[in-house]
């Protein structure tokens, strides 16, 4: 059974549930720090799942072999168990999973935060390999990448801006876990999204201090879905954990209100 953190309840004002999908090396805990309570307090039912092999969600096979299709299946499982289709909100790899989910499933709306772009993670991997050639080579050879994050400096570089206190970076770094090697292949070439198949309205948010995906890539993601990206200039990749997380949550809330959700 998938780990699911479920807070708040649907209200007359907000009858549509929200389903949050985490990124690589993370789990449902990253949404439970701030976002779930924020949206529950604003009258929504807010749920975050841990994808299989993450957090408290078991996996029937080694995590290195889990695919993007497996993660999409997890989202389908949770979404179909809700009384009405949820808004799907994905961060980083979770944004990629949301894009794939929306190719074949209808949703009232979707939100992409610092998401893997539709063209995949090829440029990201090249940038990272140039920055850390030996750790990345080791990850590719062994299928294990968690060792890359043993340095708090790298955790901050990839996920957090300088505004995040060091104690918080260390606390979150301790919660990171292994990620699937198969997903790197899927998100590089094998299973790229098809934006033309998606009809769901999307809000695309990017971070100006993102150590994973560039502002240019955030704008390219938005263009692929016929919208414009909104950039939070001083934020790092983990927009839901950064000191300015509330401004991101408030923007999502106001946008959903404008969509009648």
Predicted regions and their residues:
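Active-site glycine-rich loops that stabilize anionic/oxyanionic intermediates
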Residues: 23-27, 92, 208
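Active-site loop/oxyanion-hole signature of alpha/beta-hydrolase fold enzymes
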Residues: 56-86
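Conserved alpha/beta-hydrolase "acid-adjacent" motif
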Residues: 211-220
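The serine-hydrolase catalytic nucleophile loop
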Residues: 24-36
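Catalytic active-site module of serine/aspartate enzymes centered on a nucleophile-bearing elbow/loop
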Residues: 228-261
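Conserved alpha/beta-hydrolase
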Residues: 38-60
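Short beta-strand/loop motif that positions the catalytic acidic residue
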Residues: 198, 204-206
């Amino acid at each position: 059974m998938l780990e699911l953190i479920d807070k708040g309840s649907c209200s007359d004002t907000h009858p549509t549930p929200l389903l949050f999908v985490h990124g690589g090396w993370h789990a449902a805990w990253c949404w439970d720090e701030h976002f779930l309570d924020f949206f529950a307090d604003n009258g929504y039912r807010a749920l975050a799942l841990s994808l299989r092999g993450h957090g408290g969600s078991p996996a029937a096979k080694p995590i290195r072999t889990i695919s993007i299709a497996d993660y999409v299946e997890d989202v389908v499982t949770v979404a179909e168990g809700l009384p009405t289709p949820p808004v799907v909100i994905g961060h980083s790899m979770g944004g990629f999973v949301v894009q794939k989910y929306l190719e074949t499933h209808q949703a009232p709306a979707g939100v992409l935060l610092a998401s893997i772009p539709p063209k995949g993670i090829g440029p990201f991997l090249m940038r990272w390999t140039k920055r850390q050639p030996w750790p990345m080579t080791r990850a590719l050879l062994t299928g294990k990448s968690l060792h890359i994050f043993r340095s708090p400096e790298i955790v901050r570089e990839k996920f957090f801006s300088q505004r995040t206190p060091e104690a918080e970076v260390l606390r979150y770094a301790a919660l990171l876990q292994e990620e699937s090697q198969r997903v790197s292949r899927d998100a590089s070439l094998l299973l790229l999204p098809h934006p033309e198949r998606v009809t769901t309205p999307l809000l695309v948010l990017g971070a100006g201090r993102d150590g994973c995906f560039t502002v240019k890539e955030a704008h390219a993601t938005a263009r692929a879905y016929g919208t414009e990206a909104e950039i939070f200039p001083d934020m790092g990749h983990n927009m839901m954990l950064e000191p300015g997380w509330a401004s991101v949550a408030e923007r999502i809330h106001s946008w959903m209100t404008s969509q009648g959700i």
